[in-house]
């Protein structure tokens, strides 16, 4: 039982950390590219959410979801970027998925997405603590 309890993944650890980095940011890259390509629509969407300073919010969203996410995959500035992603992910949860202010059919999906964002922030906290692993530009 102790073997399973203290299993450290041995030689597979660097590969598994790479897979984890990709998995954590994949959602940002997938949804960030359309935000970047349709930037005017992103600004309008931010305004519709009631985001403060919609233009700035759209710029932050695009920068975090595309280049910053790609840097996480590459394992470059991983720990500081992971900390930024914690704040970004929690901020988007509060701004974009404020289910407590909603009614009807909007409550359920937004509650799910709010708590998914909280879980993703937890994954970024783990990444900030563990670092990117050996298969990274940071190599730590």
Curated annotation (Swiss-Prot):
This chain's protein is named Inner membrane protein YphA
Task: Report which superkingdom the organism of origin falls in.
Answer: Bacteria
Give residue spans on the Cytoplasmic membrane side: 1-13, 78-79, 138-140
Q: Which residues lie on this side of the membrane: Periplasmic?
A: 35-56, 101-116
What topology does it adopt in the membrane?
Multi-pass membrane protein
Localization in the cell: Cell inner membrane
PANTHER family found in the cross-reference section: INNER MEMBRANE PROTEIN YPHA-RELATED, OXIDOREDUCTASE CATD-RELATED
Query: Native species of this protein?
Result: Escherichia coli (strain K12)
The lineage is: Bacteria, Pseudomonadati, Pseudomonadota, Gammaproteobacteria, Enterobacterales
The entry's family comment says:
Belongs to the DoxX family.
* Entry keyword set: Cell inner membrane, Cell membrane, Membrane, Transmembrane, Transmembrane helix
In terms of InterPro entries, this protein maps to: DoxX, DoxX-like_oxidoreductase
A single GO cellular-component term from the record reads: plasma membrane
Indicate the transmembrane segments per the record.
14-34, 57-77, 80-100, 117-137
One of the Pfam families matching this protein, by short name? DoxX
């Amino acid at each position: 039982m102790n073997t399973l309890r203290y299993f450290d993944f041995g030689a597979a650890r660097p590969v598994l950390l790479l897979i984890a980095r990709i998995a954590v940011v994949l959602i940002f890259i997938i949804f960030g590219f359309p935000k970047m390509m349709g930037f005017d629509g992103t600004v309008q969407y931010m305004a519709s959410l009631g985001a403060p300073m919609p233009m700035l919010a759209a710029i932050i969203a695009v920068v975090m979801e595309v280049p910053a996410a790609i840097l996480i995959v590459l394992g470059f500035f991983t720990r500081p970027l992971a900390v930024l992603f914690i704040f970004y992910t929690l901020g988007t949860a509060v701004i974009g998925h404020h289910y407590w202010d909603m009614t009807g059919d909007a409550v359920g999906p937004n509650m799910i997405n709010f708590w998914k964002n909280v879980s993703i922030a937890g994954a970024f906290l783990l990444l900030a603590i563990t670092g990117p692993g050996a298969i990274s530009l940071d190599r730590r």
